[in-house]
């Protein structure tokens, strides 16, 4: 995997870890993704920022233009000039902080000539009971690097080479307290403002359409449970065997992808013994559903019809072949009989 792919891969992993943890209860989140490259030959700017409320991109900032751009209609049309000014100033401040942190990490690694990348994800999540949880993580050159611990005001090193930076940052207690204040106070306050701003959009609930499909190969029979076109994206999917929940280790983990229209799709798969498909059911829980939805695989009527048509055609072809063969044999027998009478008549 080349260096261009590593930052994107790390961001996806961090995002799944910190934000995409499917929970049945409706939660809301605000998080920012920062990324940059020390040299622009990696296809990245020196600093780019993406802001997400829940799972919707609402703001973008780029170091080169130093412009803050709204990315959703409800932000463009509803945000006040004062709130937009505060958001713009904070992103420009993050730009400066990111650059300082980037050079600190590079110096602690004795990296100066080569191109390197830095990724940061920070934000907060709010549950229905208004409890909040913050996160602040750094990735360097496509690898997890440092994570801030607001309870203890220190940093957790994800790899040995992160220790010099960890020790340096832990000497700055003022910064640690500022980080905690952001995660526990400023981030939840901004999230509340954005939720109010996005009322009617962010609080909608679209239940999933659930289907179970059947796939057969030479040696494996696989059931796939798909949940389609739902919002929000937190969803619980599991397999039941004889109406009893199965251990998650027995089937492949859930995959979730955006559809591009604001909704999501997710699926889980399970290998089953041939002929035992009816023993397994898929259970789906989602905030848009009043109760868990249980779906079983049902053979497609069209599939049965196709098999019947193919069988009928095969029988017809066999009968037609036998009929043609019978006619040919009778003609040959008739020809031989006529030849025999002609020869006898000639001898007389």
UniProtKB/Swiss-Prot annotation:
Residues carrying covalently attached carbohydrate according to the record: 110, 130, 234
Cleavable signal peptide: 1-22
An example Gene Ontology biological process: negative regulation of proteasomal ubiquitin-dependent protein catabolic process
UniProt effect for mutating residue 282 to Y: In HFE1; probable risk factor for porphyria cutanea tarda; correlated with increased serum transferrin levels; higher frequency in patients with type 2 diabetes than in controls
Keyword Disulfide bond among record annotations: yes
Disease connection: Hemochromatosis 1: A disorder of iron metabolism characterized by iron overload. Excess iron is deposited in a variety of organs leading to their failure, and resulting in serious illnesses including cirrhosis, hepatomas, diabetes, cardiomyopathy, arthritis, and hypogonadotropic hypogonadism. Severe effects of the disease usually do not appear until after decades of progressive iron loading.
Family per record: Belongs to the MHC class I family.
Role description: Binds to transferrin receptor (TFR) and reduces its affinity for iron-loaded transferrin.
Protein name (record): Hereditary hemochromatosis protein
Organism: Homo sapiens (Human)
